[in-house]
């Protein structure tokens, strides 16, 4: 896996919208730190804070602030098909929101990567 751009504790205003109608073009990992609205492959979702998502390159997605501000940690990366398969075999649910009980530890790891 090759990590590209990384962001830690980014906060955006109520008008924030990130839109990838054809997908982000590479893998995108998000640690959502505030309530947010997502459109994931045409399905509307409301996510709570402490939700992780690991998007594949061609997954259509759009996300925005739910109430006031949107905050997240994130990184873009590329990986080989073998690396993706290894993560899937370890239980990584790509393109699927998942609550985490370890948000603080995960955020600290992303901060150290940045």
Give residue ranges: language-model regions.
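N-terminal regulatory/effector-sensing and dimerization cores
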Residues: 2-93
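Amphipathic alpha-helical segments enriched in hydrophobic/aromatic residues interleaved with Lys/Arg
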Residues: 88-114
